[in-house]
Every structure is written in structure tokens, then in C-alpha cells.
């Protein structure tokens, strides 16, 4: 017995000497406290479009991914509650029946009824229960931030799809006008060819132009169908749901995001906070695994009774006490490997956090660049549209006084329509990139 105690003591001390080969740290979630910096998570309302606001509210109620994230949060809270219950004693009851006889004597069966209540409590001498509870609490935080991230991503996707729908519908009208003008040009070319004033190659070219315009219109209508499907999936509605788009794209105002927000504002991103929460959960998981290098001590007390009569077995006249000591470190190899596995889980979580932070920085950098480029392109498209509008006005006057042919007039009108489509697309790209900046930063920040 003395030798066994010595062996256990040696293994225990050896377990205490086992440490992670990596420095395990507990990370904290950055709380931004800057009186000169305010965040706005309802940035989409700045577009002043009631239809957009209504669709976002509907999506927040119906979206399947958001519901799933909400259920995951509820589940993690329940799991945390179960683990927190380990701080309290555990009450249990038991009831049993036993019948036996001595077959060598042929006695009758001796019946015994046993009933009892027991109360047990594990002493958290080495912090295993506390660490497990902390891990569960951080898992709840992770689920909260994951829900927030799903919500942010949903809003951004819906805003982008909504503006795309308006752009496509506006562009569809221009494409239809373009097709009508191209067909008018085709009739003019055919008439000229019939009177010998045009070559057959001109007929082939205009026919090819008509086909290309038809193809562009069909492709645009396919984009409308695809985007409508995306919108309905985000909203969680069926095909019979009537999508409403109140404004034309040129009526929607820009929100002018601030491109000089301090770097530390990235700590507001929900996915970054989720990664930190997961990192902390893995840290405490490691502490739980490391606690197995120490003994586990439980105290117990109980009331019980045994009687030959069932009705007399509930007296609970027998009081008992117990002390239970578990030595998980005796299975040293498995305990050590579990600790090493928890160490690797922590390192994976740390790597995921560092990668997420780097991805976030690159996403913001890209979003700023795309926004600035789209803003410049929008200004160029507006200037080009203004010049083509003046040229078309000149063509109208020239055609009115017979200084130009119908073909040149229609060509000028077609160029104007193409410029209007280009300007619409540039406006959509700018609006989309504005929303992407707010998604990349986790909110709209204003100094």
C-alpha cells in the first residue's frame, strides 16, 4: 500500500510538471471607447428608402441562416447552464429490490427493499469546474457574435441585391429601347439596300447588331431572375411574394463613408469578436484537460433504509458519509495526449483569429479601393452622359432641319441610351461598395 501511494505521488508530481510547449494566453475582446468615434449599425436607413427598410425587417424575421444562428445561441446557453449546475451539489434518489435464498437449505426467498437519497458534491480544488464553466460562457459569447455576424452579412447581401434589382429593372427599360432603335436602323439599312444605296455587308452588320442587342437583353433578364431568386432566399419567401422597389437608382443618395476610421475600429467586427471568444473557450478547454493531472475529490452524504417490507423501507434511518478520490493522472499517457490535443485546438483557434484579422484588414483595404474607383467611374460616366446628351440634342435639331439622316439620329440616340446604362451601373457599383465598407468595418463609423 505504501508503495502504491508513492507511485501515485510521483505520477501526480510528474503531471504537475507537464506544460504546454506553447504559451497559452487568455485573450480579451477589445471594447472601443472613443468619444470622438461613433458607430451606426442601422447605416442602411441612411439611403432613405422605406422599401429597403421593410425588406430588411422582413429578412431579420424570416432568414433561415439567422434563425439557425439564433438556435445555436439558445443551445449554447442551455449547455452553459448545465455546466454551471456543476457548482451545486447533485441530489439523487434510488430504489431497489432484492430476493435471495440459500439453495443448500431450501429456504424461502428473503426479500429486501432498499430506498435512499444521496447528495454529492465535487470539490473544485484545482479549478476544473471553473474552467469548464468559463469555456461554456465564452462559447455563449461566440454564438452571440456569430449571430451578429450573420445579421451583418445578411443586411449587406440584401442591400446589394436590392440595389442590383433596381439597376437591372432600370437598365431593362433602356435595353428594350436600344433594341427598338436597332430594329429601326435595320429597316433603314434594308430600305437603302433595296434601292441600291447600301451594300449587303451593311445588312449583315446591322442584323448582327440586332442579334447582339437581343442577346444582351436576354442576358439581362436572366440576371433579373437570378437576383430575384437571391432576394427571395434572403427574405425567406416564396416565388409568389411581390418584391417592391420604390425608387429609381438615380434617386438614391450616397451615404459618403469615412475612409479615415482608426484601425482599432476593426475590433468592432462581429467575426473578429467571435474568433476571440472561440480562442478564450479553447484556452479554458485546455485548462480543463490539464486539470486531469490532479486528483478529483467528491464528498457525499446519504439517507437510506433496508427492510423486508416495502412500506417500511422509506424510513431513511441510515445516514452515511463518503469521500471519493479519483486519480485520472494514473492513465498518464491518455491524460497527456488529451492535454496536447487541447493545446493544438488552442493553436488552431489562434491561427484562425490571426488569419481572420488579416483577412479583415485586406477586406477593408480592398473595399476602400473599390469604393474610390467606383466613385471616380461614376463621375466619369456622368460627364460622358452629359456630353452625349448635348450631342443628341444637336442631332435632334440637325435631323429636324434635314441636316442629318435618320440613321445618324438613331445612332446618336442609341449612344445616349448606352451612356445612361453605363451611368446606372456606375451608380450601382458605388452604392454596393458603400455597403461593403460598412460590412467590412462592422458598422458605419463617424468621427
What name fits each language-model region?
Residues 81, 118-120, 285, 324, ...:
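Outer-membrane beta-barrel architecture
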Residues 138, 145-261, 367-370, 374, ...:
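Periplasmic alpha-helical coiled-coil/stalk elements that build and connect Gram-negative outer-membrane
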Residues 183, 212-240, 370, 382-443:
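Short segments within alpha-helical structural elements
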Residues 1-7:
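Sec-dependent signal peptide recognition
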Residues 56, 114-118, 162, 262, ...:
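Membrane-embedded beta-strand positions in outer-membrane beta-barrel channels/transporters
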Residues 67, 87-110, 120-149, 273, ...:
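Small/polar (Gly/Ser/Thr/Ala-rich) solvent-exposed segments
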Residues 17-79, 246, 250-280, 329:
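Bacterial Sec-pathway N-terminal export signals of envelope proteins
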Amino acid at each position: 500500500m505504501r508503495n502504491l501511494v508513492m507511485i501515485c505521488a510521483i505520477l501526480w508530481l510528474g503531471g504537475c510538471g507537464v506544460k504546454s510547449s506553447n504559451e497559452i494566453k487568455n485573450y480579451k475582446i477589445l471594447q472601443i471607447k472613443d468619444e470622438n468615434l461613433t458607430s451606426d449599425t442601422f447605416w442602411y436607413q441612411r439611403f432613405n428608402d422605406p422599401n429597403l427598410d421593410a425588406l430588411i425587417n422582413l429578412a431579420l424575421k424570416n432568414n433561415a441562416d439567422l434563425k439557425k444562428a439564433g438556435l445555436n445561441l439558445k443551445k449554447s446557453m442551455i449547455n452553459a447552464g448545465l455546466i454551471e449546475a456543476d457548482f451545486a451539489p447533485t441530489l439523487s434518489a434510488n430504489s431497489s429490490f432484492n430476493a435471495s435464498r440459500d439453495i443448500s437449505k431450501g429456504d424461502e426467498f428473503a426479500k429486501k427493499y432498499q430506498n435512499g437519497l444521496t447528495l454529492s458534491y465535487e470539490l473544485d480544488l484545482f479549478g476544473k469546474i471553473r474552467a469548464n464553466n468559463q469555456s461554456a460562457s465564452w462559447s455563449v459569447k461566440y454564438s452571440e457574435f456569430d449571430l451578429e455576424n450573420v445579421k451583418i452579412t445578411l443586411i449587406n447581401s440584401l442591400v446589394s441585391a436590392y440595389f442590383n434589382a433596381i439597376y437591372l429593372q432600370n437598365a431593362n427599360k433602356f435595353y428594350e429601347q436600344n433594341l427598338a432603335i436597332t430594329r429601326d436602323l435595320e429597316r433603314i439599312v434594308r430600305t437603302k439596300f433595296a434601292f441600291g444605296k447600301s451594300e449587303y455587308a451593311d445588312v449583315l452588320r446591322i442584323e448582327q447588331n440586332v442579334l447582339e442587342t437581343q442577346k444582351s437583353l436576354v442576358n439581362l433578364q436572366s440576371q433579373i431572375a437570378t437576383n430575384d431568386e437571391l432576394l427571395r432566399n434572403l427574405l425567406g419567401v416564396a416565388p409568389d411574394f411581390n418584391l417592391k422597389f420604390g425608387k429609381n437608382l438615380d434617386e438614391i443618395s450616397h451615404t459618403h463613408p469615412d475612409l479615415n476610421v482608426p484601425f482599432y475600429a476593426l475590433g468592432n467586427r462581429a467575426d473578429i469578436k467571435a474568433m476571440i471568444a472561440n480562442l478564450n473557450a479553447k484556452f479554458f478547454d485546455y485548462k480543463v484537460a490539464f486539470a486531469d493531472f490532479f486528483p478529483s475529490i467528491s464528498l457525499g452524504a446519504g439517507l437510506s433504509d433496508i427492510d423486508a417490507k416495502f412500506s417500511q423501507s422509506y424510513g431513511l434511518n441510515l445516514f452515511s458519509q463518503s469521500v471519493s478520490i479519483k486519480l485520472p493522472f494514473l492513465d498518464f499517457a491518455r491524460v497527456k495526449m488529451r492535454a496536447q490535443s487541447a493545446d493544438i485546438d488552442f493553436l488552431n483557434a489562434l491561427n484562425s483569429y490571426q488569419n481572420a484579422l488579416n483577412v479583415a484588414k485586406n477586406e477593408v483595404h480592398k473595399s476602400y479601393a473599390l469604393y474610390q474607383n467606383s466613385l471616380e467611374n461614376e463621375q466619369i460616366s456622368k460627364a460622358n452622359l452629359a456630353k452625349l446628351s448635348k450631342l443628341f440634342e444637336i442631332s435632334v435639331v440637325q435631323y429636324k432641319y434635314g441636316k442629318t439622316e435618320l440613321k445618324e439620329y438613331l445612332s446618336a440616340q442609341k449612344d445616349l441610351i448606352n451612356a445612361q446604362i453605363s451611368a446606372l451601373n456606375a451608380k450601382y457599383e458605388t452604392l454596393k461598395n458603400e455597403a461593403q465598407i460598412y460590412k467590412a468595418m462592422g458598422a458605419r463609423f463617424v468621427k
